[in-house]
UniProtKB/Swiss-Prot annotation:
GO function term, MF aspect, one: metal ion binding
Subunit composition and interactions: Monomer.
Annotated residues for binding of Zn(2+) 1: 53, 55, 111, 130
UniProt cofactor(s): Zn(2+)
EC numbers on record: 3.1.2.6
Name of the protein: Hydroxyacylglutathione hydrolase
Organism, scientific name: Herminiimonas arsenicoxydans
Catalytic reaction(s) noted: an S-(2-hydroxyacyl)glutathione + H2O = a 2-hydroxy carboxylate + glutathione + H(+)
Length: 259
């Protein structure tokens, strides 16, 4: 039986350990120290490293982990990452035999051009790095709005009960923005209160689910007329150009400046 262990790091990162009680794979180990501590605490042996993109808070711990464990490193072929043994492209599959874990690889460019996500279909898990967040999405550091929207809609096509293991605890700030973008969304208002209660109790808001994101995350709702209307009223989208890409681009630009 596989499970996912949450390992907080830095100010708001989540590193993920997939394990069976004996063996473990780590997703996006930006810092080796908390990973090594968690492996020791739970008496786990590392057998694989999985990376979603090249940013330092996701790959910074790889070299140190490799000093302790001689394991394969899976990562996107199109992102510049050191120490990669298994470069991956869209449609590839990863098998970690020690865990009997099968992962499908999805190319999700936008945050970075080579960003990938891993889907464990049997378990219903998605490890999406900085592409999809609980209530939000990653900044477009390298990609275009069209690329990011396509990537997000690819993730939104996964089953609604898929658990979303994103890499940051940004949920409350994301949902504050979501309420500005779609103030009449009743499901969103309910979610905001529930997530606030979790944070007040120091409980992670991640994982989310695809179904919850589809009903409350504005970046998965760029085709909703209510959001387009809100952007038009705010002068952020032209009435004559309110297609989903224009709406998504306006949402992302607004979020970048939202306080």
């Amino acid at each position: 039986m596989l499970s996912v262990l949450t390992v907080p790091a830095f100010n708001d990162n989540y590193l993920w350990i997939i394990h069976d009680g004996v063996h473990a794979a780590v997703v996006d180990p930006g810092d080796a120290t908390p990973i090594l501590a968690a492996l020791e605490e739970h008496q786990l042996s590392l057998v694989a490293i999985l990376l979603t993109h090249h940013h330092a808070d996701h790959v910074g711990g790889v070299a140190k982990l490799l000093q302790h464990f001689n394991v394969p490193v899976f990562a996107p072929r199109k992102d510049p990452i050191a120490n990669v043994s298994h470069p991956l492209d869209d449609g590839d599959t990863v098998h970690i035999p020690e865990l009997d874990l099968h992962l499908s690889v999805l190319a999700v460019p936008g945050h970075t051009l080579g960003h990938i996500a891993y889907v464990a279909a049997e378990q219903g898990w998605l490890f999406c790095g900085d592409t999809l967040f609980a209530g939000g999405c990653g900044r477009l550091f390298e990609g275009t709005p069209t690329q990011m929207l396509t990537s997000l809609e690819k993730l939104a096509a996964l089953p609604d009960d898929t658990k979303v293991y994103c890499a940051h605890e940004y949920t409350i700030s994301n949902l504050r923005f979501a309420l500005a973008a779609e103030p009449d969304n009743a499901a969103l208002a309910i979610r905001f209160k529930a997530e606030q209660a979790k944070r007040e109790a120091d409980i992670p808001t991640v994982p989310s689910t695809i179904g919850l994101e589809k009903s409350t995350n504005p970046f998965l709702r760029a085709r909703e007329p209510a959001i387009a209307d809100q952007l038009i009223a705010a002068g952020r989208v032209n009435e004559n150009d309110k297609g989903p890409v224009a709406v998504f681009a306006a949402l992302r630009a607004w979020k970048n400046d939202f306080r």
